[in-house]
Amino acid sequence: MNFLLLVLAALGFLTQVIPASAGGSKCVSNTPGYCRTYCHWGETALFMCNASRKCCVSYSFLPKADLPRLIGNHWQSRRRNTQRKDKKQQTTVTS
């Protein structure tokens, strides 16, 4: 019984001492990432912390790409307008 209590006390102490971030230290102060040898699934490396460790940041912290939505429709509508103008010019020239 005393041995079981000793084991439980040791495990409780170890949970306080061992870091929960898988051994990774924080990157630069403003970066929401951790320095690791390999990035976890769902993370990408932004820069190197040192020669062997990368600053791994979760995809959820990265900015989304800001692309215009109607690029394809815009060019199709412009193409139709030029074809209509060409047809009008052809009819006026031939008559």
Curated annotation (Swiss-Prot):
GO BP annotations, alphabetical order: defense response to Gram-negative bacterium; innate immune response
The keyword Secreted is assigned to this record: yes
Compositionally biased spans, kind Basic residues: 76-87
UniProt keywords, alphabetically: Antibiotic, Antimicrobial, Defensin, Disulfide bond, Secreted, Signal
GO annotations of cellular component type: extracellular region
SS bond partners: 27-55, 35-49, 39-56
One matching Pfam family: Defensin_beta_2
Lineage: superkingdom: Eukaryota
Source species of the chain: Pan troglodytes (Chimpanzee)
Gene: DEFB132
Protein localization: Secreted
Function (record text): Has antibacterial activity.
Assigned protein family: Belongs to the beta-defensin family.
The protein's name in its UniProt record: Beta-defensin 132
Broad class of where this protein is predominantly found: secreted
Region (Disordered): 76-95
Signal peptide from the UniProt entry: 1-22
